[in-house]
Amino acid sequence: MDRTKRRKIEKEASLLNERNNLLESDFANCYRAFQHQLKLDQQIWRGPEDELNRLKSTIYPVVFWVDGSEKLHAYSFTQRKISLAKNLIPLFSVDLNKDTYSALKAPLKIWSKLWEDNRRLKKIIKYTSYVTVKGSELILSFGISILDSFLAPQDAILSSGSSSSYTALLDYTFLPSEDEEYSCLDINTALFYDCARKLAKSLRFANVSRDPRLSSELLPFQMRVLEWMKRREEEKFLTSNDLPPLWYHCKSLFDDRMVYVNHVYGYMTFSKEKTYLLASGDIRGGILADEMGMGKTLEVLGLVLHHQLPISLTDTCTFDQVVGKNVKYSKATLIITPSTILDQWLSEIDLHVPSLKVFHYQGIRKSNGLKSAKIFLDCDIVVTSYSDLRFELLYTESHSRTLRHEKRHVSPKSPLIDVCWWRICVDEAQMVETSQSNVAQMIYRIPRVNCWTVSGTPVRSEVDDLFGLLFLLRYSPMYLYKKQAWMQIIEKKRVREFCDLFGSLVCRHSKQDVEEELKLPPQHRICMTTRLSVVEETNYQDLLSEAAKSLHFFKDRNLDLCDEESMRRWLVRLRQACCHPQVGFGNKSAFGGGPMKSINDVLVFMLEQTNSTFSSLNRKLYSDKIIVGQIYDHIKDYNKALAIWSEVRIPVELAVKELENVIYNSKYEDHGKNLPINYFGLDHFIHLRVWYVLLHKIYFFIASAYFSLKNEKFENEFYLLAQDLRRKIMSDVIIKTSKHLEEFSEKFIPKKLVKIPRLQKSYAKGLITGHGIIEDYNRLYKELNDQKEVLIKFRDRLIHLMKLPLLDQESDPTGDEYEESLNAQSEISYCIDVYRQMLSDRVAAVSGTINTFVSHETELEKYKLIESIKKSEKSLDKQAEERDKKYLLYFEEREEARPKADQYGSLINIVSRLLDASNRSTSSFETSKNMEEYERIDAMAKEQSRICQKLEKELSIIQLTYNSRIEYYKQLQEISDSLMPPPVSNISLNNYVKDDEKKQKFLNSVIIKASVILEKEISEKQDEASQTTNVAELVNQKISEMNIPGHIHLLRELEEEKSNTQRKIAHFESRRRYLTNLYEHIVLKAESHQICIICRDIIKQGFITTCGHLYCSFCLEAWLKHSSSCPMCKTKLNKNNAYYIGESRDIYSRQEFVTGFNKRDERLEILDDEAYRQISNMELKESFGSKIDTISKHLLYLKHNELYPKVVVFSQWLDVLDVLHKSFEANGIVFIRFDGKSKNTCLKRFKEERSLQVLTLHARSQSSGLTLTNATHVFMCEPLLNSGIEMQAISRVHRIGQTRPTFVYYYIVEDTVEGHILNLSLTKHEQLDKLGLDVPLVGNINRTTEASSGGEQVDAAEIKDCLKMALKRLTTEDS
C-alpha cells in the first residue's frame, strides 16, 4: 500500500473515531467539567426528515456554534471551523436569549468556543455532543471532559493563554473559593512589597552559629535572613500536607475523587504527587530584596560560608537541561554585579571573608585565552560583571550556528557554562533590564544548583519587571512559552496566585521594620531655600511667558487640552532654569549653545538678544511704513506716499548715522572698549548694511514720487542720493571684485596663458607586436589635437566674458545693460561647466583618470538647460529660448570634441602597452623600434599631463574670479529685489465691499481720485504723441489692472500689524532699559546718579522695575500701597516685577513688600540663622547663578567647619553637574565625577584621598549598590518627584557601616515650580513611610529621559499639576 492511500485510511479512521467520541460521556483519565441536556421542540428541526425519524431509535452526533447574537446553530459532524465555514446548513437553530435557556447559556457558549479551537485542544479536551428524540422533544446532550494534564503537560500549558477558551473552561469548572483577604487587592508594586515584608516579619529567631571565617558580626535580622536563605537551598519546603505554589485542590462534583488544579499553567490532575512533577515551584534560591543599605552583601557572604557544596557531589556531574550537556559541579558561588560596584564586592569579600579564594573573571575576551573551567572548580567565589557577560553570550555553544563545513578557526567557548555552579548570585538584578537582553540570556544559560537575585529595588517601573527575575531564577514553567503563564497572573488579575508565588520566594526587610536592630545614626533632611538672582528671575519669567503662550494658558487658564509632550517639555525647561539658565537642550539652544556661561555672561547675552530684537522690530516698523507708501503711490496718491516716506526717512537716517559713529569709534577711537550698551550683540557691519538698504529704498521711492509729481530737481537729488548709497552698500564687494578682475586681467593675457603643445604622429612601420598599439595612438593623437583647438576657443571666450566691466561703477545702468550683464554671467557659468568637462575629458584621454563628479555635474547642468528650453517654449519666451539653445550648443560641441579614449585607451595606457610589447618582442629590431616609440610617446604623455595640471590651476583662478563676480551681482540683485512692489492678493470689487458701507465709501473715494490722476496722465501722453484714443476706456482698464481692492486690503493689514509692532517695540524698549540698568549695576558696578521720579532725589537704596525704571525704596513702597502700576509708564507691577538695589549696588530679587518669604515646610529641617549667614558670606570668585552659588558656598562652609568633609552631590541632569564643575574649578573646590570608564578609580580615590571633598553623581550613572559611608552629606540639587531616584542617591551614605549622622540637603528655589514639586515629593514620602516602603508604588525608579542629559520621567497628571501651579504667578499683563 502506498503512502498516500495509507494516509487517507488513517485520516478516515481518525475522523470516524472523533465522530464516535461525541457519543461518549465518560472518558478514562478525564475530569467531567460539565454534562447537560437541552430540551427543544421538534419543530425547530431543519435537517432531512428521514434523519429526524432515525433519531427516534438512535443517537446522532452533532457539533454546534453560538454566534454573536447568542443563537445556537447545530450541524452534522464536521472538523471544519464552523464560524468560518460557508454553505453549511444547520440542522436546527435556537435563540439562547430566551429565559428557558438562560441556565445553560454559559456552558453552551464554552462548548462552542472550545470546538472552534478543537484542532489545538483535541489532545486535552474530550467533547460530548449528540441529539436524540423523545416524544415531541428534540434533546441535545452536550458535555466537556478535561484530560489529566500529566498525560499532555505541554499541550495544557500551551492552551492556557489568558484569553483562551481552555482557560475560560478551567475558570468556569474550578471556581476558586472566595477569599476576602484577596478580593479587595490589586496586583501592583505595593502588593509585591507587602508579600515580601510579610515573609520577613514571619521569620523567627535564627538558630545559626557564627562562622569564625566571617570577620563581621551579623545583626539579628541578618541572621534570620541567612537561616531563611539556607533553608531555601537545603530543603524542598514542601511537606506531605502542602501543595506547591499556585496549586489548590477541590472535590469532584461527579465522584469522590480529589482534583488538583493550577489555573496559571492550565494544569489539572488527580494525583497530588503529580503536582510536584508538573510544576513544583521548588526552585532552590529566591529573591533577596532587603531595603538599600541593609547589608545584603554580608548576608550573601554569610550564606557562602554556612551552606557549601556537599562533599558527596564533589567531582560528580549533572545534566543541565538548558545547555543540554553534562557539567561538573563546582563549589564556587558566581557573583554577577554591575561593573560600577565590582571593585566594591572584591573589597567587601576581602574585608569580611579574607580566607576565601576569589577569582575575578573578566570575560572570555579579556581572560588571556582562558579556555578551561578547571580554575572555577577550586574557587570559593568567582566575581564577574554585567558588561563582561554582555559579550559572553556570543561564546556559548547554544548560541553558535551549525555550519555546513567544519570551521578552520574554532572560536573559544565560555567556561561559565562548562560547570554547574553551586550558587549564582545576581546583584542589583533590576539592572538586567529585560529577559531578552544579552546579559539575561547569558545568566539563564549558566548551569546552577542555587540561584539568588539580590536587589533593594526589584521593581524598576512596574510589576512586569518581576518576570525578568523569574527568568533569571529559571522558575519553570513560568518563564517558558512566551510569558504565557505570567500573563495569566497579570491579565486575569489572579491576586491569590501572585501572593502564593512571591509570598515564599521574596524576603524584604525595611529600615523601619528593624529600626531597633539596625541602630543607624540619625539622618537629617534639610531644606536649603534660595532665590533666583535678578538675571535668572528675568529669564525664568520669560520662560513662563513663553510656556503660557505656547500652551494657550491665558485663554482659559487651564491645560486640559494641551499636548502632554509639550507640557512635559516646558516643565523640564522651567525646572532646569531654576538651576541655571543654560541647563538642558532647549535652554542651551535659547542661549546660543556653547559652554556654560556665568550669570554676567547670561545677562550680556540677554541684553544682546534684546538689542537685536529691538533693532529688528524698528526696521520692520519702518519697512511696513515704506510698503504703506508704496500702496499709496500705486493708487496714485503721490503726495500721501511722499509724506510717509519723508516721515520715515528721518529716524532711518538717524539710525544709520548712529551706527556709522559706533563703527568709526570702534575702529579708530576706543577700538570697541566703550561700545554703547544699546549696541551689544549687534554685528554692526551687517546691521548697517540692512539699514542702508532700507534707506536706499526710501531715497529711491521719494525720487520716483517726485518723478510722478514732475519735480525734476528733487527727483534728481534723491536719485543721486540712492545711487551714492547703493555704491556705499556695494563698496566692499566692488573693491574686492575689482581687485580680482584686475589681477585676472594681468594674468590672463596671451603671453602668460598656458600653451598646449600638439602631439606628433607616429610613423613606425614593420612592427608586429606594436602595430595595433601605434594605430590606436595615431587615432587618439589626432582627436587630442582637434580637442585642443576647441579647448582654446572656450578659454578665449571665458577670458573675454570675465573681463567685461561691472555695472553701476560710474553710472546707473539701463535696463538693456543690466540684462546684458546678467546674460554674460549666465554664459560664463555654462562656459566654465563645459570647459571644466573638456579638461576632465583631456585628463581621461591622457592619464586614464575619470572624474565622475565633474561628469555628473555637467549632465545635471545640461538637463536643467533642456528643461529651461522646454519651459521657454511653453511660455513663448523666444528670447530666453534662443539664448538657452545657444548655451546647449556648447555642451554638444564639447561632446563632439571629446577624445574617444574609451575606444583606443589613454596615452598612459598606450605607453604601458608599448613597453609590454617591447618586452615580448623576439627580434632585436622590433624591440628597438618598440622602445623608441615607447620613449617618444611616453615623453609626450608626461608633457600633456603637466599641461593638464597647469590648465586646471588656470581654471581654478577663473572660478575664483567668477565667484567674486557672482557675489557682486548677488548683492546688486538684493538691492534690486528690495525695490519690488509688495505681493498683493487679487480681490474683486464686489468681494471687498460686500456688506460693508464704510469700505464702499473709502474704495469709491480712492478710485475717483486715482481716475482723475490717470485721466490727466493719459491725456498728457496723448497730447505729446498726438493720439486720440477713448480716455475713459483707458482709465477704466487701468483701474481694473491696478487691483485697488487688494492694495487697500493689504493697507488695512499693515495698519493692524503696525499697532502690534509698536506694542512689541514698547515692550522691548522697556526690557532694554531694564537690562541696561542691570548691566550697569551688576557688571559695571556703576554708582547710581539717577533721580527718583517720585521724590526727585538721587537713588541710594531703591528698586528697579522690569520696565526699566528706578525708584527710592521708600517712594515705591508707598506708591504700591495705593497703585499697582509703574508711576512712569503705567506698566502693571506685581510680585515678580521689582528688584531691590542695595547700597553695595547688589541687586536682589523679590522682597517682603512684593511677595514675603515662604514659610519652611515642617516636614523638613532648616539650618539655623547663623549657619545661613556664614554660608551666605562665603566669597566666590565667579557667579554661576543663585542655586549653583549656594551649593558652592555651602561646600566652602563645610570645608571651613569640618575636618575633611565628604559630600555626594546628586543631580538628574548632566548639564547641572557641568556647571557645578565649572563653579567648583573657579572656586577651588576639589571634586571628582562618578562617570565613564574610570568609575571604580573614582570611588577608590574618593574613599582614600582626604582632600577630595566632593563626588558628583548623575541619575543615569548606575550608582545602585554603591557604598559611600565615608560621606556624611548628600546635596540634592533639585527636588524629585520620583522618590526611587532620590532614595538611590541617599542610600549611598545612609546604610549599614555608617557610624556618623548623615545630612541630606534639598536645594529649592522659592516661588518657582520647585516649591510645588517639593511639596508633592514630601507627600509621596509620607505615603511610603506609612507603608514602610522606600521605593515608589508606581513609576520607574530609574526612568529618565534625554539619553545624553538624563532627567526623571514625570507622570502626565503631575506634569499638568506642576505647570498649573507654576503658571499661576503670571498675570494677564504677562501675556
From Swiss-Prot:
GO terms of molecular function: ATP binding; ATP hydrolysis activity; ATP-dependent activity, acting on DNA; helicase activity; ubiquitin protein ligase activity; zinc ion binding
Binding site for ATP: D290, E291, M292, G293, M294, G295, K296, T297
Main location (coarse class): nucleus
A family per Pfam: SNF2-rel_dom
Helicase C-terminal domain: residues covered: 1190-1336
Domain of life: Eukaryota
Official protein name in the record: Uncharacterized ATP-dependent helicase C144.05
Species for this entry: Schizosaccharomyces pombe (strain 972 / ATCC 24843)
